[in-house]
Amino acid sequence: MQLIIEPTAVNGFDLREADRFRKLLTVWQSKQSKNAEKERYYDGKVSLGEVNLGVAIPIGMAGLEIGCAWGTKTVDVLAARSMFDGFVDLDGESNDQLDAIVANNNLVAEYPKACREELKLGCSFATLSADPDIGCKIRFHSAQTAAALWDGEKGRIECGFAVIDAAQDTPMGEWMPSLINYYTDDAIWVLSRDGSMWSATRLPHIMGRPLMEPLIYNPTASKPFGQSRIKEPIRRLIQGYVRTVANATIGLEFSTAPQKYLLGVTDEQFDAVVNQKFRQYIGNMLAATTNPETGEKPTFGQLQQGNITPHVDMLRMLATQFSAASGLTVTDVGVVNDANPTSSDAILAQSQTLVAMAEQLNESNGDALRTIALMALAITNGVSMDELNDDQKQTVAHFKNPAMPSVAVTADAAIKIASAREGFAETDTFLEMIGFSQTDIRRIRAQEQRTRGFDLISEIESS
């Protein structure tokens, strides 16, 4: 994607905002090369040219690509454990208006996409705008199509922009957006392009903060917009994997056709063998007469076949290092011990690091989702966030258990809790723990209410 804008030349754009927008463009452009590199490693598109040590792999094979899914695994396995399930208040009750916003924006399905982008590049962004049909429109954006400036004093973004129109397939990334939203504390500036000319339209709002919220993974004081899961040590281990698999592949080729030798033959016999190498390799018989010049009998032999075991051992070592660096289990990165299979309890113990990381991810993303929910409610009701009532302000994001225990385990725990705590079996939490989805729970509650209604009618009729 190409983004070429001179902010001061945009028709109708405030000069102060044009200066901040230029800073945003500088930030966005400075991150594009690194983001593109992380995208390549996520997609497994790593060529031998960038990993070759120049010892065992010929330079001519630099363009060869070896597939590696470790970059994808680093992101997707953790993202799969962050399962957003909607919003509830502190009493555990849902908000009908907020449920409608979640459903209309398909947030439960869109969140995993935003989470993967967040883990891949360090952050992703949610933007909000008023919508006459559904009240509030919520969209998620990758760091490749959005950028923001951080306000350290307020602990949130100062301003940001997001590309609104969808990217088109063009050669060499030549596509240029034609619609960009620029978000400030008091307005959304809509920047639209007609040919090579840009114009700006200001849409004021009363939120008092940009209608843009980042989802940030593992932020630090020096990196408020977080860090990618595909960081430098991870990329180096992926390079080691690609290099080792390439060496193993080449070694296997030589093992398939081990080197042979034939001594004491005439020049004619030598030429015949050299000119028909493949035929001599696959043939069942190799015949040669005594050398009439020397009287020697030809001697045939084969050098020791290559061994692929060192390459396999190296892959296991790399997988173990990768597991430690990423928090994934060694099973996730492809190391399986068939001779002594890992028990389910051992696998669960190995995944505790990943579960802890998922809980931390849910906590930080939960705060961002709560802010998004409050802004969405405020936009829908035409008020500021400060004007929301206390019940609305108590909204929190709900996530499923990142440990992903089996239904049998959670059901057993639920039954034990119900036996010790009176009334627990009547709650929605109990039904969730024994394996029912929110849709099933609603159907169960509706049918229970219908049954109670029929019973009440029967009592009235009998009396």
Show the residue positions of the predicted features.
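Extended, helix-rich architectural segments
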Residues: 1-141, 145, 460-463
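Extended amphipathic alpha-helical segments with heptad-repeat/coiled-coil character used for oligomerization
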Residues: 367, 380-416
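Active/binding-pocket-proximal capping segment
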Residues: 322, 336-343, 375, 379, ...
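Long, highly charged low-complexity segments enriched in Glu/Asp and Lys/Arg with interspersed Ser/Thr
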Residues: 434-461
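Extended, charged amphipathic alpha-helical segments
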Residues: 201-349, 388, 398-402
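Hydrophobic, well-ordered secondary-structure elements that form the walls
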Residues: 322, 369, 430
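Long, compositionally biased
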Residues: 256-260, 351-373, 451-463
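Extended, regular secondary-structure scaffolds
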Residues: 125-230
